[in-house]
């Protein structure tokens, strides 16, 4: 379910309507994807902050809910380096949609090193041209090749990130 963004609608994850949706998704075994913005960095029209505290709260409130944080989680994954927080994030995953527009390419290997390749899901935001300097038209191959080459993915990592991980969390 998603890409959800309650904050753009003036809401929060703690609102009863959103919690009802989260419990529904959890009971159905569906993962929920959230739009995530990094706390500092890019500014663009329509940007609305996505408070990291809300994601941590949700992961603790419904620990069985599979949560996918888009755009490498807005760098939320680095909270997993905190030993008091990491156990609460077992069901939090990170997609890579639009990452070439947001981060330097070394972010992919760093992300793998921090959270493990098992928690990373390849996403594209297609038909967005995520590599506008080299793409005339949107495509999947450019980003996939960038990720594979920059992160120096093993065949096991590539298989998981490019499909296995999402399949493992779908009902």
Which functions belong to the PLM regions below?
Residues 14-122:
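Catalytic pocket-lining loop regions of alpha/beta-barrel enzymes
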Residues 6-8, 37-41, 127-129:
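A short, flexible beta-alpha/helix-coil linker loop
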Residues 8, 74-76, 100, 127, ...:
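Residue-level detector of flexible, active-site-proximal loop/helix-junction positions
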Residues 9, 46, 99, 135, ...:
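Short, surface-exposed alpha-helical recognition segments that flank or form part
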């Amino acid at each position: 379910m998603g890409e959800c963004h309650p904050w753009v609608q003036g809401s929060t994850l703690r609102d009863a309507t959103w919690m009802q949706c989260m419990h529904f998704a959890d009971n159905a075994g569906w993962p929920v994807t959230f739009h995530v913005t990094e706390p500092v960095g890019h500014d663009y029209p329509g940007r609305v902050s996505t408070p990291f505290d809300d994601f941590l709260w949700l992961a603790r409130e419904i620990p069985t809910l599979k949560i996918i944080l888009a755009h490498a989680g807005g760098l939320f994954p680095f909270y997993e380096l905190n030993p008091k927080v990491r156990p609460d994030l077992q069901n939090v995953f990170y997609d890579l949609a639009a990452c070439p527009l947001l981060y330097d390419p070394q972010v992919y290997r760093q992300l793998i090193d921090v959270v493990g390749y098992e928690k990373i899901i390849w996403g594209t935001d297609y038909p967005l041209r995520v590599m506008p300097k080299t793409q005339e038209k949107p495509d999947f191959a450019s980003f996939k090749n960038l990720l594979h080459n920059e992160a120096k993915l093993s065949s096991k990592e590539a298989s998981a990130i490019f499909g296995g991980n999402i399949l493992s969390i779908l009902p």
